[in-house]
Amino acid sequence: MSRHEGVSCDACLKGNFRGRRYKCLICYDYDLCASCYESGATTTRHTTEHPMQCILTRVDFDLYYGGEAFSVEQPQSFTCPYCGKMGYTETSLQEHVTSEHAETSTEVICPICAALPGGDPNHVTDDFAAHLTLEHRAPRDLDESSGVRHVRRMFHPGRGLGGPRARRTNMHFTSSSTGGLSSSQSSSYSPSNREAMDPIAELLSQLSGVRRSAGGQLNSSGPSASQLQQLQMQLQLERQQAQAARQQLETARNATRQRSNPSNISASIPPPSTATNTAMTESNPLASHSSQFLLTRLNEPKMSEAERQALESERADRSLFVQELLLSTLMREESSSSDEDERRDFADFGAMGCVDIMPLDVALESLNLKESSTGKEPPPPPL
C-alpha cells in the first residue's frame, strides 16, 4: 500500500496522499501530510505544540528499512500524548506514562491504536495509563517462537516540543475497553496477516460511511417525497374546483341565454339525426299555429247555447255601433271641410265688391228684425 487510503489532509485537503502521515494526539480526527506538517500548518484548534504520531505506509517502510525484521525487544516509535516525547515502545510508553503522568486526566488519543492496523484511529481516553494497562500490555512469555514483529511505524526525528497544552472541551471519546489490539495478539500476527487486515478495516469503514450517507439521503428525501405528494393532492383539488366553477358558469350562461332567446332552444340542442330533423321541421309550423290559440281556448269559459247567442248579438251590436261612429265622423269631416270652402268663396266675392243675393225669406226676416228694433228704441234726448 503506497497511499493512506480513506485519509485526507486537514490543511491542504488532499485525499489518499502518499508519504508520511502525522496524526495529532490532541485534536480529534486531525491529520496532516508531510509537507503541511513540515511547513507548520495550524488552525484555531491545532497548534504546532500538539504531539503528533508519525505513520508510514507499507511501501515507505520497506523503502526506509529494507524489509528488516525487528524483534519485540527492539525499539518502536510511539509518541507520548502528554509531553510529546518520541521513540517509545508499547512497554516503555506504559512505564513512562505511569511514572510521569499518573495523575494527568487530560483527554488524549491513543497513539498505539492510531498506528496499528485495524485499530481505532480516533480512540479518545481520559485515563491513558489504564487504557495502556488493559489494552496494550504484552506478556513476553506468551510470544510466538518466532518472536518477530514487522514494524510498520517509525519515529520522525527533529520533532520539537514546548509550552503547556490546553485541555480540550469538545472531544468525543469512547469508554470501550476493546478499542485497540493487545500486543500479544498483534505480535502473533505475521506480516502477511497484518497486511490483510488493512483492506478489511478500510472496507468496513467505507461500508459504514456509505450506509450512513445512504440513511441520511433517505431521511432527507423522505420529507421531500411527502411534500411532493401533498403538492400533487393540492393541485388536483384546485383543478377539480376550477372545473366545477367553470361548469357552474356555463350552466348559468346557458340558462340566461335560454331565458332571453327562447326561440334558440331548439338550435342549442344538437339534433340526433337527419330524419328527426325533417320530422321536427314539418311539425313545427303546426305546433306554432296551434299554440297561438292554446291559451285562448283554455281561458274561454264554458257557456250554454243561449249565452253564446247573446254574446254574439252583443258583439254584432258593438261592431255596428263602431261602424256607424266611424261613418259619422267621416261625414262630419267632409261637411266641415265643404262649409269652410264656401266661406272662403263668399269672402272672396265680397272683397270683389259684389253683393250676394239673399233668399226672400231671409230678407223678410231681416227686415222684421230691423223694424222691431227701431220701434222699441227710446227717443233721443232733447238738445
UniProtKB/Swiss-Prot annotation:
Source organism, top-level taxon: Eukaryota
One GO BP annotation of this record: negative regulation of HRI-mediated signaling
Chief place of localization: cytoplasm
Coiled coil: 224-261
High-level lineage: Eukaryota, Metazoa, Chordata, Craniata, Vertebrata
Binding site for Zn(2+) 1: 9, 12, 33, 36
GO molecular function, one term: transferase activity
Record field: compositional bias (Polar residues): 280-289
Pfam families in UniProt: zf-Di19, ZZ
Zn finger (ZZ-type) start-end: 4-60
Pathways per UniProt: Protein modification; protein ubiquitination
UniProt name for this protein: E3 ubiquitin-protein ligase KCMF1
Residues at which Zn(2+) 2 binds: 24, 27, 46, 50
The entry's keywords: Coiled coil, Cytoplasm, Endosome, Lysosome, Metal-binding, Transferase, Ubl conjugation pathway, Zinc, Zinc-finger
Underlying gene: kcmf1
Subcellular location as annotated: Cytoplasm; Late endosome; Lysosome
